[in-house]
């Protein structure tokens, strides 16, 4: 420990009255004490208090701390890091002693969840569709290279292989659209059944296309690949925790730009599964690229298909940035995810998805419209319903996550500005606890 290191300790006792009646942080000669405000150093309330206190400590410009005293188990240590970490500058934490298993888990989270946060925070100039795909491959090879094989398809090859949605959305950019199809197969058996397919939206920048976003909505659109990054991290963390089932990952990566070659309103996309889609809003592009990945996933006949995307503003309007929205016709799968979310202390909330939502996308010229009719305003539900048309067995084993909690445009009590990494641990837990 250096002279510049601040000690951080935990206490169930209230702060001295001079710090204020509801103070959760006090200072002495050695450093800071976090007062969790409960009789236990564990539990959801304590974790939230620790994370908020860590955010305050970082706000003081303190860049080197040591977690000292009792109570610094894995959960509390991770809560501290979640709040302490910021998008710029270096921070050093001297961790308390943990068991070998907990130390490995902490190090895996630091590598993988921080990779997710760093990747989402990258400016679009530094992260195009192909870079996103190769970064995902690099992470997964670093974790479990012997179990990984992959294929990258890009540009005109997408059109020739009938990935119509991804090619249509991405063709307006100088940076080619890319589909990453990655196979995690730790069994060593090339004929092993696929347990799960993960399909991620990887829009590395979203202008809205000709349905152009205003600057106030476009300024955070480097984060529109948050679903792809989250699923990559989830598979990597599950692999690091010992996942022995075969999982395939599909990342649908593109820019959504305005150019002479960009797609237009009224265009009709013809998908490999026979569906035709009329484009009536080029800013509803995420569902168009995900459709290609979902068709591929369905062809694998997996037990589960899970897609993750920063898909709609409607989900964010309903839940803010505090929860990921989840949609499914499969109650058992929803219950399994909610149990995993509870175990990992991550926020998910189910929103409605019913059979009637599937009929809210009428078109006079195609099978589907890429946005709901004006009379049907449940934007997040109809977006999920659109995706269901590209899942072969959509009523069982399919889960859609509209990941509203991936990114924050400004700092709040518990989070710095930028990516949060929320959802990675829950999805890793789900893959592990339900793989048979």
From Swiss-Prot:
Keywords: Aminopeptidase, Cytoplasm, Hydrolase, Manganese, Metal-binding, Protease. Belongs to the peptidase M17 family. Its cofactor is Mn(2+). Its main location: cytoplasm. Mn(2+) 2 binds at residues 201, 206, 224, 285. Pfam families: DUF3663, Peptidase_M17. It comes from Pectobacterium carotovorum subsp. carotovorum (strain PC1). Probably plays an important role in intracellular peptide degradation. This is Peptidase B. Its EC number is 3.4.11.23. The lineage of its organism: Bacteria, Pseudomonadati, Pseudomonadota, Gammaproteobacteria, Enterobacterales.
């Amino acid at each position: 420990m250096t002279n510049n290191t601040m000690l951080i300790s935990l206490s169930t006792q209230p702060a001295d009255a001079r710090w204020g009646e509801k103070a959760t942080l006090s200072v002495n000669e050695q450093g800071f004490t976090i007062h969790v405000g409960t009789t236990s150093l564990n539990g959801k309330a304590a974790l939230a208090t620790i994370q908020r206190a860590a955010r305050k400590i970082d706000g003081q410009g303190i860049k080197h701390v040591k977690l000292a005293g009792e109570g610094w188990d894995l959960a509390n240590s991770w809560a501290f890091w979640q709040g302490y970490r910021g998008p710029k500058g270096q921070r050093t934490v001297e961790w308390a002693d943990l068991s070998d298993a907990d130390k490995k888990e902490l190090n895996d989270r630091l590598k993988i969840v921080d990779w997710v946060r760093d990747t989402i925070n990258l400016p679009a100039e530094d992260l195009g569709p192909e870079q996103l795909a190769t970064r995902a491959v690099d992470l997964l090879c670093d974790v479990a290279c012997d179990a990984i094989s992959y294929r990258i398809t890009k540009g005109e090859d997408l059109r020739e292989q009938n990935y119509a949605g991804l090619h249509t959305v991405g063709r307006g950019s100088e940076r080619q659209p890319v589909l990453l199809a990655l196979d995690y197969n730790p069994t060593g058996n090339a004929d092993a059944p696929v347990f799960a397919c993960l399909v991620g939206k990887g829009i590395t920048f979203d202008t809205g296309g000709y349905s152009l976003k205003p600057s106030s909505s476009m300024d955070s659109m480097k984060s529109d690949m948050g679903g792809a990054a989250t699923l990559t991290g989830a598979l990597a963390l599950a692999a690091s925790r010992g996942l022995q089932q075969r999982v395939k990952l599909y990342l649908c990566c593109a820019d959504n730009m305005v150019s002479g070659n960009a797609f237009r309103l009224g265009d009709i996309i013809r998908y490999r599964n026979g569906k035709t889609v009329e484009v009536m809003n080029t800013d509803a592009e995420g569902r168009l690229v995900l459709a290609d990945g979902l068709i591929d996933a369905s062809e694998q006949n997996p037990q589960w298909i899970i897609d993750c995307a920063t898909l709609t503003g409607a989900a964010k309007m309903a839940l803010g940035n505090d929860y990921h929205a989840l949609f499914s016709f499969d109650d058992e799968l929803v219950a399994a995810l909610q149990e995993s979310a509870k175990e990992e202390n991550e926020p998910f909330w189910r929103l409605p998805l019913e059979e009637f939502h599937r009929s809210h996308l009428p078109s006079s010229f195609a099978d589907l419209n890429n946005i709901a009719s004006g009379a049907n305003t449940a934007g997040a539900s109809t977006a999920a319903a659109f995706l269901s048309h590209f899942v072969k067995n959509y009523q069982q084993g399919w889960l859609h996550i509209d990941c509203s909690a991936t990114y924050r445009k400004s700092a709040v009590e518990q989070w710095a500005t930028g990516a949060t990494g929320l959802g990675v641990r829950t999805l890793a837990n789900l893959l592990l606890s339900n793989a048979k």
